[in-house]
Amino acid sequence: MITERLQKLRESMKNKGISAYIIPSADFHQSEYVGDYFKCRQFISGFTGSAGTVVVTLEEAGLWTDGRYFIQAEEQLKDSTIKLFKMGEQGVETVEQYLNRVLKDGDTLAFDGRVLNAKEGYGYEKEYSDKNINIVYEYDLIDELWADRPSMSKDKAFLLDVKYAGESIQDKLTKVRAIMKKQNATMHILNSLYDIAWLLNIRGNDINNTPVVLSTAVITLDKVYYFVDEEKLNDEIKAEFNKIGIEVRNYFEIYDFVKTIQKDEVVLLDGTTVNYKLYRNIPSNVSIIDAPNPTFIFKAIKNEVELKNIRECHIKDGVAMTKFMYWLKTNIGKIKITEISASDKLEQLRRSDKDCFDLSFPTISGYKEHAAMMHYSATKESEYELEQEEMLLVDSGGQYYTGTTDITRTYILGDITEEQKLHYTSVLRGMIRLSKAKFLYGCRGLNLDILARGPLWDLGIDYKCGTGHGIGFVSNVHEGPNGFRWKIVPERNDSCILEEGMVTTNEPGVYIEGSHGIRIENELICQRGPKVGLDQFMEFETITFAPIDLDGVNPEYMDKSEIVWLNNYHKEVFDKISPYLNEDEVEWLKQYTRAI
């Protein structure tokens, strides 16, 4: 099927004189996860991961993806003729290096300019400006092949009440306009769905598990133009927007609107989130400031109301996770449980709380060697039945009106080897070491990542991903500019100074291909610690509360401070979660939060 699609794509390319065609993962807004309409890269390659770029030439094809997906991509591409390029690995060509090698004098490089960001687009422009290589950005060639392509979402939007958001739309606009004035901008084009959701306190269902609305906002110093499918807006939204001067326009009208921008305007935009076609439609005599959206940092630093809500929703999430662990541990070997039925049970427990309206991403439920694929997705064909042996990794989260959660636990279902216990305990040690870090203000995740990775590096083991990511508020489960990783990855934009109020995950892991995978993940709020003289120290507050499976822990591998932290953490889990459990669950929880 994939080879047939590639053949048809190449026929179309030949007819149009195209030598190479780029198919990224993004939608028109550079979203990480996308709606079904935008899954062109998945359609042409069969690779289902959330990140990757396909390049097709008339002779060959390649997929570039990151370390989270190496194992999965190898499996999904094996019969496709598409070559896997492992991004970030030594000696592996980047997309740009590959194109420079294969494109010849007179060739044409093409892509849909709506799904490539402006920075990438003008990067290609600059690269090939002095070479005889043409760039065409008006072709959506996949649309021609995809006969039963899903339509764009028509789901309704809703306003997020200020009791959850903590700030009014007007107050947020005032903050954005203050930054615009500082930068001498008269207009700001905001194309990131997550930033628009934060700024306008609007949420929707246009991307599975990510409550955003397909839209673009243009902010001037006294007005806002909001480009959206108006059918998605209810009367409450229209009334609120009308009251504060937000003018609603057709979603696709933005491309013509920007053509009319006057030359005396100074436009602020972020070239990594504005798409290339939108950027190219702005008249060339208009001054452009290409800089991060002001909302990028505003939404990352949670306000006091958001933090209060986030803490509350993590208790609810912890109750669901604890009930799930009880169900799993007491039923394994007694009833049939599969990777999918376990995932379904957890979703049922989460959604039993009326505050939970969705998952924050498709649950990763990986048993045995499946857990070595960081973002494994079980299917009816691939799923395993769980037995009283080995380990089950479950990475999951919920969308609550009070916040977004992300938690991973690895459960011991029976006998495991001493090596697996060493791996499990080392992952736990790394998670603990980062959790209890004290550091000077000015540190970035780059400075702290080794705390989590250190126990594994001591064993000669690494994991091919960051240690943690920022997390949105009733928004995308992955959010910058905060994160933990050991080296700078510019396109991730997640290595900022850690500020008070930022929420970041802490999730070291071990992934042994063909054998097992282990990950333990909590969320952390960055907060001020003591000030000593002129030195402001910072620390983390752990906000995730669910038992860590002690059946995988060998205390002999831990130092005293790590054991003290774990015992204190489990006492807090019991104190916070037990009031919401039945009698049997409470008795069971005593055993799984015992001091070691």
What are these regions (language model features)?
Residues 1-596:
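Active-site neighborhoods and metal-handling regions in enzymes and metal-associated proteins
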